[in-house]
Amino acid sequence: MSLAPGTETDLQNRFRSHFCGRLNTEYENKQVRLAGWIHRKRDHGGLIFIDLRDHTGIAQLIIQPEKQELFQKVERLHVESVIAVQGTVVKRSEETLNSRIPSGAIEVLVDDVQVESHAVALPFPVADELQTSEELRLTYRFLDLRREKIHQNIVFRSQLISKVRRYLEDHGFMEIQTPILTASSPEGARDFLVPSRLHPGKFYALPQAPQQFKQLLMVSGFPRYFQIAPCFRDEDARADRSPGEFYQVDMEMAFIEQDDLFEILEGMLRYLTETMSTKRITQFPFPRLSYRDVMNRFGSDKPDLRVPLEMQDVTELFVGSSFKVFASNTKEGSCIKAMVLKGRGTESRQFYDKAEKRARELGAPGLAYVQYREEGPKGPIVKFLSEAELSALQERLAIETGDVVFFGAGKWEKTCKIMGGIREYFSDLFELDRDELSFCWIVDFPLYEFDEKESRIDFSHNPFSMPQGEMDALDTMNPLDILAYQYDIVCNGIELSSGAIRNHRPDIMYRAFEIAGYSKEEVDKRFGHMIEAFKMGAPPHGGIAPGLDRLVMILRDEHNIREVIAFPMNQQAQDLMMSAPSDVSRLQLRELHLKLDLPVETAEQEPG
């Protein structure tokens, strides 16, 4: 396990003089006091061997048969009982050396044992990391956290937070705490609401992010802010998203431009990677790719750049084609995308059927493909394509014999996303380097999008981002062509964070909202406190907030976010260990002036 904080001297007391994992041959013949949990216990012909575990690792103890009182005391103990011992460090014999643990060259001959806590039979073993159901692990999380792998994850997380603080403080940032009880916002995800006892009928909300507070700190004259910020969103769980709450490294800076922020965050991520991981960053500074570019090439705004697959636009090759499916998608707003899979042109029919099934799940009517075989092009659509079109495709896409090319056709955005999903589906065919961190910035997001359902223009992402070109762009450009100073940081297909250079000018803000159909009065009603603050002198500012949990996941090579959180909820947003959420009494509800209006199937569970 990872080393405990502090030194031996710092933590000496009646329980311990040393840590288990730090003992070595330098301590030979020295008296030591150790304390911890019984990891394993073995009786070998009258000798009892105990692997004693503390936060730093394991030390082997020996209870000799002549110590009858100690022998009987220890013999009755279950694993995971807590003991404090005193004894003498001795070298192990050559045949008993254990190179798998740092203390494997020594053992401790025990003179005294104090039993601090008796452990009952356990619901699952700690010493052997056997497959255990997640439900059981989360119910007994305090036990699960003793297991080496997850214990190290939490230690790593603590050390990473410490390094983040050090880096940001060295770069002029101040750590400032923002409120946990705040106002509900109609934007974004669903809020967690907290009823007010003192103000009947009114509610606080737990913050989805400290967004407005950190911007107001810039208005208050603090140049650089950060916080290891808890955020609360009532949303469903995913492998890389914890339901309910998560933590982010929340940052904001005044008097900066986009490049300044990129330099700070890239430096921090490189520092963390180099000091805490054996992984390597593929390219530094991180490449910057426009939203339009990544959608055209990868079909996703969070691409895994390790996957050696790219889409290419072949729309112009099929203008006037006799294949109507392609010809009808050569007009403005539509496209034909092609993606070559090298060396897969001779796969079985099942291979292509599975790929087509995935395409249908993504919303496509099917998945067209052409196999370039020794005997010539094959596949379901070959009969509809001319020899000239097949040759032009082969030349444009550098197709070789044995390759297969897949196609998507339709409206640009939908087609890109479907083909991006197919790219992700095929990524399992490649042996990706798990030690490679392929960071990139996604920039130049559109400020607006056209809402097909509402038949109107609306903001595509963050309405408070500064438009590129500022007021001039809003007054002179087609709204759908206006780009925002908004950016995402992505690593290996995982979005770590979104950020933006903020719109700090009320006149530009009113105009931006006007284009999206919001009146000045409506903007004032929704965001009046922010507008008022900006009217009193707001500096140019911007920020970002990388997800702490996701960052630890990436650096620790974990695929499940619950493996890097000490006490996570399950996928149904339940804390199985604390039995939350739980019923509350009628008295508690009455104090908050609340009555329950439960769905029929749960009404019988109303608290009595």
UniProtKB/Swiss-Prot annotation:
Residue segments, region Aspartate: 211-214
Annotated site (Important for tRNA non-discrimination): H44
GO molecular function annotations of the record: aspartate-tRNA ligase activity; aspartate-tRNA(Asn) ligase activity; ATP binding; nucleic acid binding
Binding-site positions, L-aspartate: E187, R233, H461, R502
InterPro entries referenced in this protein's UniProt entry, alphabetically: Aa-tRNA-synt_II, aa-tRNA-synth_II, aa-tRNA-synth_II/BPL/LPL, Asp-tRNA-ligase_1, Asp-tRNA-ligase_1_N, Asp/Asn-tRNA-synth_IIb, AspRS_core, GAD-like_sf
Catalytic activity: tRNA(Asx) + L-aspartate + ATP = L-aspartyl-tRNA(Asx) + AMP + diphosphate
UniProt cross-references to CDD domains, sorted A to Z: AspRS_core, EcAspRS_like_N
Pfam families, alphabetized: GAD, tRNA-synt_2, tRNA_anti-codon
Domain of life: Bacteria
EC number: 6.1.1.23
Keywords, ordered alphabetically: Aminoacyl-tRNA synthetase, ATP-binding, Cytoplasm, Ligase, Nucleotide-binding, Protein biosynthesis
Binding site for ATP: R233, D234, E235, E495, G547, L548, D549, R550
A GO BP annotation: aspartyl-tRNA aminoacylation
Assigned GO CC terms: cytoplasm
Localization per record: Cytoplasm
Family membership: Belongs to the class-II aminoacyl-tRNA synthetase family. Type 1 subfamily.
PANTHER family associated with the record: ASPARTATE--TRNA LIGASE, MITOCHONDRIAL, ASPARTYL/LYSYL-TRNA SYNTHETASE
Role noted for this protein: Aspartyl-tRNA synthetase with relaxed tRNA specificity since it is able to aspartylate not only its cognate tRNA(Asp) but also tRNA(Asn). Reaction proceeds in two steps: L-aspartate is first activated by ATP to form Asp-AMP and then transferred to the acceptor end of tRNA(Asp/Asn).
NCBIfam families attached to this UniProt entry: aspS_bact, PRK00476.1
Assembly with partners or alone: Homodimer.
Protein name per UniProt: Aspartate--tRNA(Asp/Asn) ligase
Organism annotation: Prosthecochloris aestuarii (strain DSM 271 / SK 413)
Record lineage: Bacteria, Pseudomonadati, Chlorobiota, Chlorobiia, Chlorobiales
Gene name of the record: aspS
